[in-house]
Amino acid sequence: MAKAKFERSKPHVNIGTIGHVDHGKTTLTAAITTVLAKAGGAEARGYDQIDAAPEERERGITISTAHVEYETETRHYAHVDCPGHADYVKNMITGAAQMDGGILVVSAADGPMPQTREHILLSRQVGVPYIVVFLNKCDMVDDEELLELVEMEVRDLLSEYGFPGDDIPVIKGSALKALQGEAEWEEKIIELMTEVDAYIPTPERETDKPFLMPIEDVFSITGRGTVATGRVERGIVKVGDVVEIIGLAEENATTTVTGVEMFRKLLDQAQAGDNIGALLRGVAREDIQRGQVLAKTGSVKAHAKFKAEVFVLSKEEGGRHTPFFANYRPQFYFRTTDVTGIIQLPEGTEMVMPGDNIEMTIELIAPIAIEEGTKFSIREGGRTVGYGVVATIVAE
């Protein structure tokens, strides 16, 4: 069969399957591709093809992830499925696989299990905004009341972590039976995807977000002024826009972009993904430095203290060989620069072992432009020893 070309005209959404080991995440992923393939919206992928996910070395960490793509009537999806629990932790904290929404798979025969809870918590911490539930293995449960109990348990668990548990769509099905081609269960997969289409909103495009550019380098051009270079992370910047210079300083400075240059050509505007030089009015070379960001006025603030979800590299991954304790002072690398910070561990946690993932409070020695969801790495003498994501800002 010739490989059908995916229509790029449909809105694109990134999703993934999450949930406890052996509850059927991979079987469900295979079932979705198989059922949608009948309508011409996917290439059917067998369980074995998905399960044998190649290990990816993403910045020195080994993560196994399966990527599949498929489409419904209205959308194009990229779907990630991870074989192991540790793969989810790494994936979600490093942002290797960005998720606009998740399908939480819970076995109706077993109910919520420890990793069900952990994945819901992780989704909350790293900012997966929407979750749809697939109660799997319903063919193995004859008791309607038992199914309702499991559904209630899952809804309560979601509410406990700040998701709207009462409103979340819950679909009862059997991934295995659907994969085997049984019509009544195939219907449930269609129902699941209809709910995913309706419930998980199309993400805002990067270009529609407020402008932000991390500053990589600064130089002055005689007679013209100071230029800050970097890659636009999000939004659009036009000549004449007023922007703020944020981070590493007591006060934010405000300036006007008087020129935008890319590949030595002058542009009227630049957008997310472009590598540019921005000419800034009235800014002295020494007033601006790498590690600061240029951003739309009022869109982001500099903070020094925050709570973060952190994954500490194991010795095998090139991380530390020994644990660290409270008041550990490594460097935190945000976008383009390292800033020293002090770690506070949660109550009752004495130390953190290589390979752990943990929530901690971090206080930087200088404020940096951050918001919930900002990713960073933890370094010691230029060597990466961990990755993290800002979960909440701590008011100072």
Curated annotation (Swiss-Prot):
Entry's EC annotation: 3.6.5.3
Broad class of where this protein is predominantly found: cytoplasm
Region G4: start-end pairs: 136-139
Domain tr-type G: 10-204
MF term (GO), any: GTP binding
Region (G3): 81-84
UniProt subcellular location: Cytoplasm
Assembly and binders: Monomer.
Primary role: GTP hydrolase that promotes the GTP-dependent binding of aminoacyl-tRNA to the A-site of ribosomes during protein biosynthesis.
Protein name: Elongation factor Tu
